[in-house]
């Protein structure tokens, strides 16, 4: 080893010890004295907070309108079922969002192996319990949405953000995207030739089985390196302006008129005039609607009130309507 007053040793990945399928020890050495704790603490925080993963974010259960209800023939209440789905370990290849379904009937346990999914989805623990059916005539059907993300996003922070697009009966789930369940590190003494004042860093992690430990360490180190690049060059570098692409139309305008929950009479009158989307409706004026057969002032008032509740009105001008997505349908 070449002795140098200012030179630094570069650590190497010495050993990956697979204790169980989800429990791993990773050893790196040699590190300069003190660097074991410096790097160990930084990597630990990044591994806990910044590893991307997949989590269940929304669930629709037939016959269930809210999470505080129960379902006949099911032992668990809806909140407990959502908690069980929250802990479901899912790995998806090549997609940021997927939908899965479940349809089970008869007495017995409902597990992750009962979930129907496509070939891009991998469920790590097929025996993961979801609920119990306690009656021969009992059944449960659900639609499960899985998304990619990082960190922890509680359902409460997404309620208002997704209200306009979320159908009735869609239950939000606290999204725990991190594939790292637990992580700790330990620093031991290491030796290289005559030097005995070096550090050995041992990182012990427990995952949900969706990430390779070596890949996790590599990602965490890359994130740390990218964050430290700003300190390498402290000159004032002007950040490039990022232009946010706004959607061509507000999402609510692309929703069908049926979502307004109008009376049957009003809804049928609009469909007869080929008014299928809310964007079609808001462009009509009061005079135009009153010319619609069988649509009177009472129906017009109903339509205006419902639009006003959504910050919309009749007589709006929408350029480039209808969008290409509707024309393709």
Curated annotation (Swiss-Prot):
Homodimer. The RNAP catalytic core consists of 2 alpha, 1 beta, 1 beta' and 1 omega subunit. When a sigma factor is associated with the core the holoenzyme is formed, which can initiate transcription. The N-terminal domain is essential for RNAP assembly and basal transcription, whereas the C-terminal domain is involved in interaction with transcriptional regulators and with upstream promoter elements. It comes from Buchnera aphidicola subsp. Schizaphis graminum (strain Sg). CDD domains: RNAP_alpha_NTD (cd06928). The gene is rpoA. GO terms for cellular component: cytoplasm; DNA-directed RNA polymerase complex. It is an enzyme of class 2 (transferase). Pfam families: RNA_pol_A_bac, RNA_pol_A_CTD, RNA_pol_L. Its EC number is 2.7.7.6. Belongs to the RNA polymerase alpha chain family. Keywords: DNA-directed RNA polymerase, Nucleotidyltransferase, Transcription, Transferase. One of its GO terms (molecular function) is protein dimerization activity. DNA-dependent RNA polymerase catalyzes the transcription of DNA into RNA using the four ribonucleoside triphosphates as substrates. This is DNA-directed RNA polymerase subunit alpha. It catalyses: RNA(n) + a ribonucleoside 5'-triphosphate = RNA(n+1) + diphosphate. Residues 249-329 are annotated as: Alpha C-terminal domain (alpha-CTD). The keyword Ribonucleoprotein does not apply. GO terms for biological process: DNA-templated transcription. Residues 1-235 are annotated as: Alpha N-terminal domain (alpha-NTD). Gene3D superfamilies: 5' to 3' exonuclease, C-terminal subdomain (1.10.150.20), DNA-directed RNA polymerase, insert domain (2.170.120.12), RNA polymerase, RBP11-like subunit (3.30.1360.10).
